Amino acid sequence: DTKMYLEVVEEWKRREEALISEEEKQSLTEALIKMLPENGQSYVIDGKESRVDSLQRYGEFLQTQVSFSVEACLEEIRNSRADDKEEPVEKEETLPDNVSKEQKAEGACRIGNTYYEDLSAALHAVKDNETIYIVQSHAMKDSFVYVEKTRTRKFQNVRILPEGGPRTVRMPDRHRLAFTKSSVAIGSKGSDPLTFDLSGTSVPDSDNLYCGAICANKGSSVTFENCVFQNGDQLSRWMIHGEYGSVTVDQCKFQNCDNGVGVVTEASSAFTPTEISFRVQNSVFDGIADIGAVHFSIHRANIRAEIQNNVFKNCRIGIGGIRSDEAPYTGPISARIQGNTFQNCYIGESFSQGTSVAASAFQVNVSNERYHGWQSTSQHPNVGDLYSGWFSTGFCNSNVEASVNGCSYENGVHGIATMSKGRTVVNNTTLARNNAREANTEQCGQKGNGGGIFLNGGTIIWNSGTICENQADRGGAIYLKDGEILLKDGSFYGNRAQNRGGGIYNQNGTVKQEGGNFSANTAEIGSGVYQDGIYQMSGSALVDEGNDVYLPAEKYIEVMQKLQSVPAARVTPDRYENGRMVVKVNYGNRTGSMEWERFLLTPQSRYCLRPGDYQDRRAGTLKEAVTISSEYTVQYDKNTKAQVEQMPEPSVKYWYEKAAVSEQIPKWLDVPFLGWNENQTAKEGQYQPGENLPAEKNQDLTLYAIWED
């Protein structure tokens, strides 16, 4: 109904202090009426067709019911005015007594009808629940910072918005914004972008209370929406810095900062511990250096971080742009990293401080990440896309929990790297075409290892996913130097090691394979697995027969539960000698005969695999072992030139195992058969048909038939 819409217009005029002409009012009314449904139904609020007491409520109602859009109405009015040949008559503006036209013309910001020369001046004047409008792009003439208690300003629910189009605030040398115990919302997703140009800003490390270009200090709550932060080359610290409280970054862009960090939040031990809320989402980080695009450093506070649906590209430092640092830290962390995309990112100097951590809880959830083309340029341990303080544990030395779900790490240096202690759970993740041989980590003594996974301490639980077509000097798919990895399922194929361990290189670590298949991997030694630690197999675990498990001196495979595949693996020992244990059965009755048929031995001469419980005690082998054994041939000689019927076929005897003489009795006319003897000229039988040969007869034998004279 028209009357109601006119009331809406009046309410709009009153609440927004807009100067709406009668012509504009009529056009707006007509536009609103056009947006009613065809049946002309009128709408009411709270059951009344009377005065509307809230334009916002009515707008929300109309948006839901009739797709009402104030922006669409205004656009229609602007278009109609542009087509009108008559110039509109400007209404004389009434200025407050304390504002002259000259002041308004020179003012870059306004609060209500009061204008201020720059953003800093407006912040010194703003009160709770007020909005600062940036009406002109300008350079700040002074900082708004926390220096002394007498200069500290606190305010709540203040907004900072651009007005009349995109606006830029340039921050000259040493000029910055630092909010203290305040709540501020900067920018809006529904407004034009607000840009902060930091090209002249330098922030020395000594200014540790407000060492970012824009700071949320002492428990402030600051939200950034639809903002651009650029040209931070002179920064020695951060574009956005939060310390205790809440920082939210949504739909923002950070670009061209070769000497700083995009977003950082921290909790210094100099202040009372509290909880930090840290959220970065729907934003773009392009060309961020120093210690990462997003960084959080905590000392004693509890922290909740959410980093979601961002794009990180060309970020040279920090795990594809995300990194954390603890020094020292004792409180709990909960971090969720989800739906981010990383392109052409590097890792540089990482975790140069903060090696003392005793966290009560460190929980990180990483999901739906896409990493493409990152590199390692650091002299620190060779890690690739993610390192340490996130889902890998790094220098966090206790109680670290992390999960990685539905991620893809491709065309980088390493897929996943975990250092020190901790526990990482991986689900439905792909590590593909990474090349650890390109890592620049010579000073660590670990250059080029672990194309898919680099594990040096801690635990990784791989529930599902694929590790394929990665390259490394050692450990094409997985490299372990200490630590433990549990493989429950997955496909590990096409990985290549220049030296050892095409699938896995295990040096002093523990591999527990309960499922999954290694196939088509290549290496000079150990195409499937190079096992120089502990390697346990069970269930559906499989190393395809085209790959092998190489066993250095005194190393073997442990079978923890019944294996399903036949064969489950092919083993290659460092040396072929009788009694060399290659498999140990560690479940049930613990006898080698329970599993020995599920393993193959890479062929060499007469050697084969036999169960230890079949062997004589004089062999010195364990009953739970599967060992290397020699295979001996037992031949039967009729010991006459005459024709003999029913001669036994050759049989086999194994090292330190008993073997039965054939039960078949040869027949030579009516000449009585006396038995078999190793001596061709013997007069009596040494062995009778069906009798066992001695276990210690570890040689090829020819048994001669002995006939009665």
Label each PLM-derived region with a short phrase.
Residues 128, 140-163, 168-193, 197-223, ...:
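Extracellular beta-strand-rich solenoid/capping regions of secreted or surface-exposed proteins
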Residues 4-124, 368-393, 400, 406-407, ...:
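Extracellular/surface-exposed low-complexity segments
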Residues 181-184, 219-220, 245, 269, ...:
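Small-residue (G/S/T/A) turn/hinge positions that recur once per unit in extracellular repeat modules
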Residues 628-709:
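Secondary-structure capping and domain/repeat boundary segments
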Residues 142-145, 165-166, 172-177, 198-211, ...:
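Short glycine/acidic-rich loop motifs that flank beta-strands on beta-rich extracellular proteins
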Residues 133, 159-161, 170, 178, ...:
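Extracellular beta-strand solenoid repeats
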Residues 119-126, 140-153, 175, 535-540, ...:
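Short, T/G/N/S-enriched strand-turn elements that build extracellular solenoid repeat scaffolds
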